[in-house]
Amino acid sequence: MAKVSVLNVAVLENPSPFHSPFRFEISFECSEALADDLEWKIIYVGSAESEEFDQILDSVLVGPVPAGRHMFVFQADAPNPSLIPETDAVGVTVVLITCTYHGQEFIRVGYYVNNEYLNPELRENPPMKPDFSQLQRNILASNPRVTRFHINWDNNMDRLEAIETQDPSLGCGLPLNCTPIKGLGLPGCIPGLLPENSMDCI
């Protein structure tokens, strides 16, 4: 049984300009005191084509953690535009929040992110080289995808199997303007960015 349960993730200041920091308010509960730190990360998926474009925006150690409910605001700088392929700068991608204990990842919360120009002229005729100063970032806060992993909480043994679950308590916000694939609830423009068997929150 997991010793840590994530109760809620609230996306703050959304939508916002591309260069604005990411801010998430994370609430979690420990069923018993943890002797060591939890490591939280925010990861920006720069391209669906390769993990080499993933950017770890920030990581923070929280602990030792006493039993009970806890809440903190996790802020990370925007991704480095120079590390994002120009063809992937505008459109839909993913931001991930992960947490590990003893180096074992036990939860991953993924959000679709839509980067688009607000200026109608730029939207109609986008520049060849993306102008990140004109992009707005909109996180699909209402539809997080939550993946939980069985881990060994007492030592550093290998992580056990992963399970995909839905958690209706996580997230609320504005939807993206992206056409879903019928029956899947997945934006048609980005199949495969998140696991096919992960579940939408209702």
Curated annotation (Swiss-Prot):
Quaternary structure annotation from Swiss-Prot or TrEMBL: Interacts with histone H3 (via C-terminus), including histone H3.1, H3.2 and H3.3, and histone H4; the interaction with H3 is direct. Interacts with the CHAF1A, CHAF1B and RBBP4 subunits of the CAF-1 complex. Interacts with HAT1, NASP and TAF1. Found in a soluble complex with NASP and histones H3 and H4; the interaction with NASP is probably indirect and mediated by H3-H4. Interacts with CDAN1. Found in a cytosolic complex with IPO4 and histones H3 and H4. Interacts with CREBBP.
Protein family (similarity comment): Belongs to the ASF1 family.
Modification sites for Phosphoserine: 198
Subcellular location: Nucleus; Cytoplasm, Cytosol
Biological source species: Homo sapiens (Human)
Tissue spec. comment: Highly expressed in testis and at lower levels in colon, small intestine and thymus.
Protein name: Histone chaperone ASF1B
Biological classification of the source: Eukaryota, Metazoa, Chordata, Craniata, Vertebrata
Modification comment: Phosphorylated by TLK1 and TLK2.
Region of interest (Interaction with histone H3), ranges: 1-156
Name of encoding gene: ASF1B
Keywords: Chaperone, Chromatin regulator, Cytoplasm, Developmental protein, Differentiation, Nucleus, Phosphoprotein, Spermatogenesis, Transcription, Transcription regulation
Known role: Histone chaperone that facilitates histone deposition and histone exchange and removal during nucleosome assembly and disassembly. Cooperates with chromatin assembly factor 1 (CAF-1) to promote replication-dependent chromatin assembly. Also involved in the nuclear import of the histone H3-H4 dimer together with importin-4 (IPO4): specifically recognizes and binds newly synthesized histones with the monomethylation of H3 'Lys-9' (H3K9me1) and diacetylation at 'Lys-5' and 'Lys-12' of H4 (H4K5K12ac) marks in the cytosol.
One GO-annotated biological process of the protein: cell differentiation
Keyword Lipid biosynthesis appears in the UniProt entry: no
Residues covered by region (Interaction with CHAF1B): 1-155
Source domain of life: Eukaryota
Record-linked InterPro entries: ASF1-like, ASF1-like_sf
Recorded GO MF terms: histone binding; histone chaperone activity
Chief location of this protein within or outside the cell: nucleus
One GO cellular component, as annotated: protein-containing complex
